[in-house]
Amino acid sequence: MIILNLFELLKQIQVSPGLYLGRPAVTDLFIFLNGYEFARSQSNVDLTPQEERFYDEFQPWLQRKLGVMSVTSWAKLIMLSCHDEKTGFDRFFQLLDEFNQESIADSLMAA
C-alpha cells in the first residue's frame, strides 16, 4: 500500500503501531511525526493544507481543549491525563478525530 499523506499514515500507525513505532506510545508517535515532517521538508515535499493545519493548529487546539497553557509537546499534554503511553497513544487518535471533525465543521461554516 502506498501512503499518500499524513492522515493515511496515521491510520496505518493506529492499526499497526509496532511496524512504525516499535510499540504503541504517544511519545514515540510524537517523535515519529516530527521526523516525518522533517523528512518531507528535506525532500522538498510540501505538506498539504490539511497536514499544515495539523502541525500548526493541533497543539494550540489541545491546549484550549484541556485548559492548559504550556510550551510542552502535545504528547506531554496528552500524558497529563493518561496513566501510560499506550493509553496516551489511544487518546491521541480520539483527540485527532475530534480535532478533524471540528476543523471540518469550521470549514463548512466559513464557506
Regions found by a protein language model. Name each.
Residues 2-37:
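Short terminal alpha-helical segments
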Residues 8-13, 92-95, 99:
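C-terminal ligand-sensing/allosteric alpha-helical core of TetR-family HTH transcriptional regulators
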Residues 18, 37-41, 67, 101:
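Residue-level marker of positions within ordered structural domains that often coincide
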Residues 19-22, 42-45, 71, 105:
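Intrinsically disordered or highly flexible coil/loop and linker segments, enriched in small
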Residues 25, 72-75, 106-111:
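Short glycine-rich, low-complexity/disordered patches
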Residues 28-40, 60, 95-98:
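Short, hydrophobic/amphipathic alpha-helical patches that form generic packing surfaces
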Residues 43-97:
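Amphipathic protein-protein interaction modules
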Residues 94-111:
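Intrinsically disordered, low-complexity terminal tails and linkers in eukaryotic proteins, enriched
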